Design a protein with these regions (language model features):
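Residue-level preference for beta-strand/loop junctions
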Residues: 73, 88-92, 110-112
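Short, cysteine-centered beta-strand-loop-beta hairpins and adjacent loop/turn segments enriched
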Residues: 69, 98-109
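A short, acidic/glycine-rich surface segment
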Residues: 2, 99-104, 139-141
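Short, low-complexity N-terminal intrinsically disordered segments enriched in polar/charged residues
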Residues: 1-39, 145-148
Length: 148
């Protein structure tokens, strides 16, 4: 029912949103990433418990994590998508992967899961994120120390 359907136009537009954000994370492109989000975004993260607002999300979550990881990737084939009947609100869950760096300089697999809520004003608009919740998988170190 909520599994990814690559024949669904809305699902494909959401895949595109995730791939676009993935590219911004990989390139540490904070300013371009902001375009994908509403200013009033509210989030949970691996670094922040609760963060309100895009500027705080960027300063306190993204800039604390992105410089310390590499190979960030949303595994979009794991996407589950719930779309409202009017097709203006979507809730997605997805698995993600990255490479972190231990204090001693050794790399480690840094993976987890995310819930992302997107909205748009009409079905021809691009999606904007209003909520994210990122969690590391069990047993994954909470901190990555430097870019690899």
């Amino acid at each position: 029912m909520y599994k990814l359907d690559t024949d669904n136009k809305d699902h494909n537009s959401i895949i595109f949103w995730f791939k676009t954000w993935e590219n911004k994370v990989q390139n540490k492109d904070y300013e371009s990433a902001k375009i994908l989000f509403e200013n009033h975004v509210v989030s949970f993260g691996t670094w922040m418990n609760v963060v309100e607002g895009l500027e705080k999300l960027c300063a306190n979550q993204w800039k604390s994590v992105w410089p310390t990881i590499n190979n960030f990737k949303f595994l979009t084939d794991t996407l589950y998508i719930q779309i409202s009947p009017d097709r203006l609100l979507a809730n997605s869950i997805v698995i993600w992967d990255s490479t972190g760096c231990k204090k001693n300089g050794n790399s480690f697999k840094r993976n987890g899961r995310a819930t992302v809520t997107l909205k748009r004003n009409n079905i021809n608009d691009t999606w904007k994120c209003i909520h994210t919740h990122f969690s590391l998988n069990r047993g994954i170190p909470q901190k990555s120390y430097s870019s690899i």
